């Protein structure tokens, strides 16, 4: 079993792995050639094309989700899990407001443990990169009246049918 320590950074130039006594440390570059990495640039552009401009906090949430997704899809349970299932993952994440996020650590860790069965830890550090909002949002149009998450499972199918 290996503990993973994933360090996201906007000043990291390339993906680097380092094995220590108690963990595998991975430096994860959030920028590639000056653009957001791991699909975040595409998401940013797609949102902007729909006149949606996330705040710095909204961008923090997108980055958190991206790092959780990377960890979940790249760290094999069979190889790195304590019981061939439970993994131990710590994520160091640059955010816009460290104090705000530190108040949410327990909630985020418990939520992810419930959803994945893994042991999660978070360290929030000050983000040294700004999610620029050069354009001004125009008047929003009411294209949608509500949203529903749909995973394809029976419970979300029933919920979606009830909305129709």
Residue ranges and their predicted role:
Residues 1-147, 160-164:
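RNA-binding accessory domains that recognize and position tRNA/RNA substrates
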Residues 150-151:
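Catalytic nucleophile serine of serine hydrolases
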Residues 155-156:
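Hydrophobic/small residue at the entry helix of a nucleotide-binding pocket
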